[in-house]
Amino acid sequence: IMTTRVPEFWIAVVACHGPGEAHVAANRNPLRRYAVRRQAAAGTPDPTIVNPAHLGKELSAAVCARCHALIGGFHDAPDYPLHGYAFRPGQKFEDAFVRARLVDWQTNPALEAELAKNPQIIRDRYWSDGMIRVAGREYNGLLETKCFQNGEMSCLSCHKMHESDADPRSRPEWADDQLAPGMQTNTACLQCHKTFAGDAALAAHTHHPVASAASNCYNCHMPHTTFGLLKAIRSHTIDKPSVAASLATGRPNACNQCHLDKSLGWTALALNRWYGTPVPPMNADERDIAASVLWTLKGDAGQ
């Protein structure tokens, strides 16, 4: 275990809550502070400061994206060395940054110059289907996730940036991923996917023992796909195991990350048997040789 100390990673109050001068001035009055607390308890936030928890999913996620996004550039580039990012919490991400999903590199003329300077940028940072493959860019993964696109999921659905006094975990345990209490478990997904609550429903879905790693939603739908900060990091593109995707992109799938002695052919047959997933065409090596061995001997370091 490595323990480090830093004073600040440019992640102080303003980074998440915006400039606080007006907030401080307004709340010097203790009567106002009392009134604001009563209003907050009733669901009305203090208008003098930004609280990401009270923003919609896009604006809330944009606060995190300031640090956790792969960007194509920022609109205030000439002023950046002196003043930093122009982005302030509560703004749209696109107000300050050039969005950089894989499709943006392929369609946005504003990114052509950057791509011309570094033609490897797509291969180095994305899997060929658009999934982000570098650490610390979880916002890009979130953008590709149906739970975000079609639902109300945001970063704060699982993460909690301030440790609660009632949190039974130690400070290092909380700081590892900064997940809210209970969000290290299937409780995170059961916030929405309630049909899988209960041991019987879970086992019927996973086809694995309830207490096993394979019945942990994260391990199948958010497998570890990047490495950074001295650890493996989970994909934030919530997806399902797919042999077809592994064959098309070279990206390891959740099943073969656990079953290191099994081939893609074995996984394809299991997914077909359990979920009716079509078995994709594959060559003899992919059908018969352990996927972990194939990925070790060929492909690239991202595997």
Where are these regions (language model features)?
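Primarily the internal scaffold of c-type cytochrome electron-transfer domains
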Residues: 1-303
